[in-house]
Amino acid sequence: MSTGQLKRFKGCEYLTHRLVLATLSGTPIRVEGIYPDEADPGVKDYQVSFLRLLEKLTNGSVIEISYTGTSFIYRPGNIIGGRVVHDCPTTKGIGYFLEPILILCLFAKTPTSLTLTGVTSSNEDIGVDVLRTSVLPSLQKRFQVGDELELRILKRGSAPGGGGEVNFLCPVIKESLPPIRLSEFGRVFRIRGIASSTRVSPAFANRLVESARGVLNPFIPDVFIYTDVRRGDECGNSPGYSITLVAETNKGCSYAAEHCGEAGETPEDVGSFCAKKLLEVIESGGCVDPYTQPSTLTGMLLSSEDVNTIVVGQLGITSQLVVFLRDVKALFNCEYRFKELESGQVEMSCLGKGYLNVNRRIQ
């Protein structure tokens, strides 16, 4: 159960990560000023849904939402994990709910089997393909948790109807996370990707592949993009298509980019836009891309009591990062040190807290 004094926050930017940090630290929080000036003020359906998901993953959590919905109190309980099924609203992608809790489930009482339903690919939120092909392999390598950390895409669901389904499997860790030291990002030596479609012609996926390769092949010959065409019971009711690209370096780093087709966009537009987006991320440099950065920074915070260091590109320095660092300072009393390098990248370092899994079952 949560202990300590109630911490107050204003605004709901990066709310999901704030709630996860509060759960890990066991600190009760009060969040105020949630969309107070909008025509429809107060917490949105997807924010309430994330609170309910945390309630399912924990035991003893208490959530109190004000009458107007512009503020709420969250008192975190113990992280228990286990088998959980959650239906995500179609206003947000599944990645909005899954990405923040990747670290949380490592510190549960029992291994987690989480089934989420909803929209699998969205331009507003991280897609499940990026999580499966870029973020999770990075966490497996740096946190030494092995292949038990897995994400299965059972059904694909495009916006606005959703209907997708994924299953996330996560083990529990017995010791502190190892320190993270990433200073060299190396050179890109290959690019892999997935072009997916739901309830449209299979030719759409092939057109995505050809347009992306047309942009990337002049820079690197080793480009291979898989196609995943879903129809019938393998997907939701909405037609759609998307592409995810992951560039791997000879130092074990990866950069990802994704894009979903919207109204008026052809598969050629989507494929070439995503490829150019990937080139921008590669040019920015750093050892982690913006998708992997939140989980990596949280892992640095929770790692054994040693110095952690990573290098991030300019694309990783955002307003959301500032909010995250303020929340870390408020909830863990920990600070990150910044050092700008001659190359234009930024070196971030912090001292790990030596966080232990006090929830796990003693065997």
From Swiss-Prot:
Gene Ontology molecular function: RNA endonuclease activity
Alphabetical list of Pfam families matching this protein: RTC, RTC_insert
Compartments in which it is found: Nucleus, Nucleolus
Keywords: Nucleus, Ribosome biogenesis
Superkingdom of origin organism: Eukaryota
Transmembrane intervals: none
Main location: nucleus
Purpose: Does not have cyclase activity. Plays a role in 40S-ribosomal-subunit biogenesis in the early pre-rRNA processing steps at sites A0, A1 and A2 that are required for proper maturation of the 18S RNA. Rcl1 activates bms1 by promoting GDP/GTP exchange.
Subunit and interaction comment: Interacts directly with bms1 and the U3 snoRNA to form a stable subcomplex. Component of the 90S small subunit processome also known as 90S pre-ribosome that consists of the 35S pre-rRNA, early-associating ribosomal proteins most of which are part of the small ribosomal subunit, the U3 snoRNA and associated proteins.
Name under which the protein is recorded: rRNA processing protein rcl1
Origin species: Schizosaccharomyces pombe (strain 972 / ATCC 24843) (Fission yeast)
